[in-house]
Every structure is written in C-alpha cells, then in structure tokens.
Amino acid sequence: MKRQHIMAGSAIALVLVFVVAVFGYSWLQERRLVELAAKPDSVFVRPHSPTYGSADAKVRIVEFLDPACETCRAFYPLVKDIIDLNGGRVQLVVRYTPFHAGADTAVAVMEAARLQGMFWPVTQRLVRDQRTWGADHNPRPDLIWSLVDGTGLNMRKAREDAVSTVVRNRVEQDLADARALGVTRTPGFFVNGRPLKRFGEKEVQELVREEVERAYGGGVAP
C-alpha cells in the first residue's frame, strides 16, 4: 500500500511539474510578444532594407534571410507568392543574416546590387544557384561573382561597394537587430511585429492570413 501511495504521489508530482512547465512556457511566450510589441519599428526595418510589394501595404513580413540557408531557399518562392497573391496588401522586408559560411560575401553582393536597383535579380540568381556556391560541406563564395555576372549588374562598381564600410555597417546593423529580436536561425519571420510561434510553411501562411484579416477583413488569396 505504501508503495502505491508513493507511486501515486510521484505521478501527481510529475503532472504538476508538466502543468507548471506548460503555463511557464505560455507565460514566457506572451511576455516575449509584449516585449516585441514594445520594440521600435526601426529594429524591424531600416532605410537600407530591400522590399518587395507595395509600400502602402498594411501587412509587413520581415524575413531575416541567409542566402546560404537551404530552408531560406525553400521558402523563397512561397513568400514571394504570398506577396503576389495579396494584391498590394502585403509587403516583404528582407534583413541580412549571414549565419552560414560564405554567406557574408553573398549578402555584401546583394547589398551592392541593391545600390544599383538590382537586388532582386541578383538575389534570385544566388538563391537559384545556392548549391553551387553555398553547399554546407564545401561553400564556394569565390564563385558568387561569376554567377551574378550577366544579371545586368555593373560588376566593377559592385565589387567596390561590396567591400565598402557602408555595406559592412549595414550588414552589421541587420545582425544587431536580429540579436535584439532573438533571431538565432534562418529564415526568421515577423508579421507586423509578431513572430512565428511554430516554424513551418503553413504557420507563415496562417500568421499572414491573420494579419490580413485584421487589417483588411479578408484572408490570403488562394
């Protein structure tokens, strides 16, 4: 009988620990949301941040992007489709987060391209050919310049800008903002300041749908 009482007591204790852990996690999540809501808008978007979609959109997706990240490559068409299907209601803001080896070269080239109005063609090329230059087991950032040649980029100017203090400072600013927002992996998504609670394609779509509904009274276009 005593053994049964001990086992029952242990089971109850485990249940209580589980309940406390669940409520504690929920409380921390809610607290984080409150803290993020109090962050200045500049931590989500900077004057240099590349954008895709209407500047008048009421819903803004901020993506912390690493061009060498395979998951970022997988999400790239999904996010652009969300923008295109929403007819001016959603805008994408890109932030540079070169966590992987070789990605620092890539984001410098991307920012140099942005200075020429060529961010999206160059980014598209780097994402498309990611396996060529950004493979985890053997990154080859030295191939990046040859890959983006032919996109219409002024190569001489881009090479100068990519190693400039201005570009370096902008990448460092994005990394500092990523740290401030607790971004530790890519892609990192925020929709109107709200982070994903769970990571996944459906979760991104659902969070955008909620914000579109809140702002416009209609969900994401199919």
What residues fall within each predicted segment?
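Ser/Thr/Pro/Gly-rich low-complexity linker/stalk segments immediately outside membranes or between
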Residues: W27-S42
